[in-house]
Curated annotation (Swiss-Prot):
Pathway: Amino-acid biosynthesis; L-tryptophan biosynthesis; L-tryptophan from chorismate: step 5/5. This is Tryptophan synthase beta chain. HAMAP family: Trp_synth_beta. Belongs to the TrpB family. InterPro entries: Trp_synth_b_CS, Trp_synth_beta, Trp_synth_beta/beta-like, TrpB-like_PALP, TrpB-like_PALP_sf. It holds the Pfam family PALP. CDD domains: Trp-synth_B. Tetramer of two alpha and two beta chains. The modification N6-(pyridoxal phosphate)lysine is found at K87. The gene is trpB. Its cofactor is pyridoxal 5'-phosphate. One of its GO terms (cellular component) is cytoplasm. The keyword Amino-acid biosynthesis applies. The beta subunit is responsible for the synthesis of L-tryptophan from indole and L-serine.
Amino acid sequence: MTTLLNPYFGEFGGMYVPQILMPALRQLEEAFVSAQKDPEFQAQFNDLLKNYAGRPTALTKCQNITAGTNTTLYLKREDLLHGGAHKTNQVLGQALLAKRMGKTEIIAETGAGQHGVASALASALLGLKCRIYMGAKDVERQSPNVFRMRLMGAEVIPVHSGSATLKDACNEALRDWSGSYETAHYMLGTAAGPHPYPTIVREFQRMIGEETKAQILEREGRLPDAVIACVGGGSNAIGMFADFINETDVGLIGVEPGGHGIETGEHGAPLKHGRVGIYFGMKAPMMQTEDGQIEESYSISAGLDFPSVGPQHAYLNSIGRADYVSITDDEALEAFKTLCLHEGIIPALESSHALAHALKMMRENPEKEQLLVVNLSGRGDKDIFTVHDILKARGEI
């Protein structure tokens, strides 16, 4: 199929979907390309971002956790966005696209529940029906978000197949869409999947990096040495990285979930520890067995519990423009506690992975003068029960 935009990032990406979905993807690409050139669409999107979602979000300088070091650390506060995470940005854009295409229903998948909440709120706002697929395990561990979705009128459908987590929810959502695309838009929640989704999601998240660049120049008079973001599928990270890719003096650091430790096999770090394959409509690194079956990923944070990664991250890794590292559950938990105790901010466990790596950089080289920005992609209200249970089991509370 001929596309309007390049469906690949180097060798990664593409449109590996059943033929039945090709017209839906073509229609989506055409709608996106025309919307990007339409001042009225852009004005409507920007108005929602400003007056409904609460953009621009703050860039907060950490006051206490850098004490005794020469590191200056800022947090890009996507946790302050309406809905509680960066997810709200791009769902507003996709919901407007759905209306533009004449769709009346939204289908979505969710892991931590943040994309589900964002999809539900955008659907409620714009008068769209919404059904959300969620792994049964995630329904259990993210009950506050499940109730939020239902309060906003969404139907939440637990998925019991496979590992009953995000990858299984993705499969069910795609299956639904293949039979309902004439009336429904599939609101994919990350910068992965078949073209044009990775490009659409990046463009509807790129204001994170654009705002960060303007804010850090105003505050510090220079660009940061590095911007750091957690990577599951990779939407918050690509939103932060996009405006810095051509700023070659700025390091781009993506943090994958190391789970119980890479050596245990219980992690979600396919970029550094997976093999290239085809899954979820794209060619990308993924966790797979010797015979090519998709392996179950694992992370303390439901939103990073994904066995593959967006194709642009795979490309940035392959050309050496971005560095990808991993952080274990325990390291993320320590960072979570540190930010709560010393800055009065409760971060999402996903974002805590990025913070943990920044703290590691700071502690490993306390004398080094460095200016770092962490994308605090979401707030941790949804995670307090998970953290409570872990700390209680350890006898720490």
